[in-house]
Amino acid sequence: MDKKAARIRRATRARRKLQELGATRLVVHRTPRHIYAQVIAPNGSEVLVAASTVEKAIAEQLKSTGNKDAATAIGKAIAERALEKGIKNVSFDRSGFQYHGRVQALADAAREAGLQF
């Protein structure tokens, strides 16, 4: 089993558990160059809010789109957008990535901005 397959296996297991709970999920995906965050409805078929470093408005404010500063900016942005839509409580779905570095920075920034998980 290669590294990507192991990550996907971890992500699938966590998503199944969150689906059983019927929770609204804050999903994080990262690549070496960008980081993405989405708030997904409990049924899993609808993206309620999204933010990523691909967005021109956010990318222009950042020196680099693939570091902790970028992850912090995305965490704040996703929290602000979720709160505008009335979403306060979410379950954090790290997509099988380690809770470290950019993933942790995004989560911490979202918590500081008012999301609860």
UniProtKB/Swiss-Prot annotation:
The keyword Thylakoid does not apply. GO terms for molecular function: 5S rRNA binding; structural constituent of ribosome. GO terms for biological process: translation. One of its GO terms (cellular component) is cytosolic large ribosomal subunit. The keyword RNA-binding applies. Pfam families: Ribosomal_L18p. Part of the 50S ribosomal subunit; part of the 5S rRNA/L5/L18/L25 subcomplex. Contacts the 5S and 23S rRNAs. Belongs to the universal ribosomal protein uL18 family. This is Large ribosomal subunit protein uL18.
